[in-house]
Amino acid sequence: MPCSRRTFFLALAVAGPHAGAAPAVQRPQHSSVPGGVALIPLGSANERPVAQQAQLPLLVVGGPAAWTALVGIPLAAPAGTARIEVQAAGALPRSVGFEVWPKKYLEQRLRVAPGQVDLSPADQARYERERAHQRQVMATLSPPLDADTLAMAPPVPGRRSGSFGLRRTFNGQARAPHSGMDIAAPTGTPVRAPLAARVIDTGDYFFNGRTVWLDHGGGLLTLYCHLSEIEVRTGDLLRAGERLGAVGATGRATGPHLHWGVLLNRTMVDPALFLAAGA
């Protein structure tokens, strides 16, 4: 069965008989449901194994005594057995299975300006261009960071006004499920990077408004939308806690808030799974 939904982190010790073993790495909560993250133990190996699912590289963390693959599970994934492919140096390729459990998300009904639901031809063309660009950004894959934690602090203080996975209707019309966490806060509230990162995209988009994408390495990206101000540029390197912008209500928004998204192996997953204990 899926684990408890409490927010906690698994710190898997990798110290052992291997000389020079890395310290424990804090990982996100294991939640093997659509929109969740599955933590798949890969065992020991002197070098980091390569893991893939549907030919997409997966983030592998840990050290020689214990490696773990982090698998982002799409919201549309069916319940049942899923598999990843693993290749360790000096070993035969192997397939590792894990169970995906069903999860039903709540519904959210919103009212926005009609032009933000029934797009004009010009706005539709703009959206299509922006969507193609965003897909390129989401395909970013850089080497995994040598970090001892993936635990994130909330990027902004405030009330969680919208949770991940909500089945949304705008003006009575069904649209895509909510792909992030909404945090309500006053306009101008600083937004900070939850982990060390490189800025890989900034822009002002039709639905997302003023937006920043951060790359944390290994296919782990984070997204910040509806900003009133963007305070970074593409290519900037940020430390955890550095400002990247300020809360706003740009794009399709019903009020000032931050839409915070987490992308893992090109899949939007629940940001709450990455929050440090007590956050």
Please place each PLM-identified region on the residue numbering:
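Cationic-aromatic interfacial patches
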Residues: 22-96
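Zn2+-dependent peptidoglycan hydrolase active-site motif and core
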Residues: 194-228, 256, 261
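Conserved, short, structured surface segments that act as functional micro-motifs
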Residues: 211-216, 236-279
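N-terminal secretory signal peptides and thylakoid transit peptides that target proteins
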Residues: 1-14
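N-terminal signal peptide c-region/cleavage motif recognized by signal peptidases
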Residues: 16-19
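Extracytoplasmic
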Residues: 35-37, 64-66, 79, 93-95, ...
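Short, well-structured beta-strand-loop connectors
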Residues: 190-200, 231-247
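Surface-exposed, glycine-biased beta-strand/turn segments
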Residues: 97-208
